[in-house]
């Protein structure tokens, strides 16, 4: 059976990457694509590497233009997808929202951090957080999936085994994350302008990044109690990839490197796309580029009684 797929917001970096993945999928066929800036023109007019390979004409971003689809991906900025998602689900479509509109379960939290108009706030408590390593069975049965953010994916997967074990002092988690420039999207800003980001490493939105409540929401669910994190993102001069270095104080007094390695190997034993490394083979962004892998290495520091976790993903895929 071929799944007929639509993409709303196809002109961005995420939309382009989605085309690559779907065109190489044996059971998927892209039948509709839309944007606000390229209506009436072929997708290849923006993603020029697709010239002669995929020349589907982009349609207006209206729900009825996706009537033929079984699944619709929304690759839209925050505030732009909730209304369209509501219409599509009412038409019986499965919707996967790659943006931020459906990730937070609490409407007030969404308004505090995003401040954008939300056209379907009543659905937020029921939207499934689309991290298959944690919510696989729910994802299978739901029509609305909230795709996780890029920073949160690297951090949540990096910490999940420890929080499930109760090995972490919950008030001690510090997340230092570095992202390639595509994580900022296609809209040009001073920070992403080539002369400014090339040969430059910069911190931004320290203690104020919008992914913070998403990280805290999912880590709190894993820990079974509310927690806060210190999240410190940085922009690095490369196109794609995220590396998160997460440090925390251990709650377990007799922890060893062997116990740490075993806990991660056990937790991710059946996960095809999580690869557990070790402190002698720390993961790098180049190792996961273009892939769906998350590579993780936990490290025990007996001198400071701290746990350090290195987690890497490709922000345009995983």
Segments predicted by a language model, with ranges:
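Generic secondary-structure signature for well-ordered alpha-helical cores
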Residues: 23-27, 164-168, 209, 217-224, ...
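Short beta-strand or tight-loop elements
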Residues: 54, 127, 227, 292-294
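N-terminal Rossmann-like NAD(P) cofactor-binding subdomain of oxidoreductases
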Residues: 1-199, 204-206, 287, 299-303
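Short acidic/glycine-rich loop or secondary-structure boundary segments that cap or lie
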Residues: 154-155, 182-186, 238-242, 255-257
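C-terminal active-site/capping subdomain that shapes the small-molecule cofactor and substrate pocket
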Residues: 244-318
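A short coil-to-beta-strand element that immediately follows conserved catalytic motifs
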Residues: 30, 170-174, 226-230, 273-278
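Oxyanion-binding "anion nests"
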Residues: 208-239, 243-245
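Predominant activation on well-ordered alpha-helical scaffold segments within soluble catalytic domains
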Residues: 19, 156-160, 212-216, 261, ...
């Amino acid at each position: 059976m071929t799944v007929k797929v639509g993409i709303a917001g196809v002109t961005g970096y995420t939309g382009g990457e989605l085309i690559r993945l779907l065109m190489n999928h044996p059971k998927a066929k892209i039948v509709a694509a839309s944007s606000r800036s390229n209506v009436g023109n072929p997708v290849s007019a923006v993603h020029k590497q697709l010239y002669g390979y995929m020349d589907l004409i982009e349609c207006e971003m209206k729900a009825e233009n996706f009537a033929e689809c079984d699944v619709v991906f929304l690759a839209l900025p925050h505030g732009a997808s909730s209304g369209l998602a509501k219409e599509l689900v009412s038409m019986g479509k499965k919707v996967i929202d790659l943006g931020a509109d459906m990730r937070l379960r609490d409407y007030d939290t969404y308004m505090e951090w995003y401040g954008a108009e939300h056209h379907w706030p009543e659905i937020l408590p029921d939207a499934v957080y689309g991290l298959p390593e944690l919510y696989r069975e729910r994802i299978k049965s739901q029509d609305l999936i909230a795709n996780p953010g890029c920073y949160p994916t690297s951090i949540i997967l990096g910490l999940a085994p420890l929080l499930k074990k109760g090995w972490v002092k919950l008030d001690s988690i510090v997340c230092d994350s570095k992202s390639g420039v595509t994580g900022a999207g296609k809209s040009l800003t001073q920070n992403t302008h080539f002369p400014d980001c090339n040969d430059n490493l910069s911190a931004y939105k320290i203690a104020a990044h919008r992914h913070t409540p998403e990280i805290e929401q999912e880590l709190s669910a894993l820990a079974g109690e509310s927690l806060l994190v210190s999240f410190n993102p940085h922009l690095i001069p490369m196109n794609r990839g995220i590396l998160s270095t997460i440090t925390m104080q251990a709650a377990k007094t007799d922890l060893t490197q062997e116990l740490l390695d075993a806990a991660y190997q056990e937790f991710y034993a059946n996960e095809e796309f999580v690869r557990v490394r070790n402190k002698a083979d720390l993961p790098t962004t180049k190792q996961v580029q273009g892939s769906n892998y998350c590579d993780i290495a936990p490290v025990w520091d007996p001198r400071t009684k701290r746990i350090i976790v290195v987690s890497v993903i490709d922000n345009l895929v995983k």
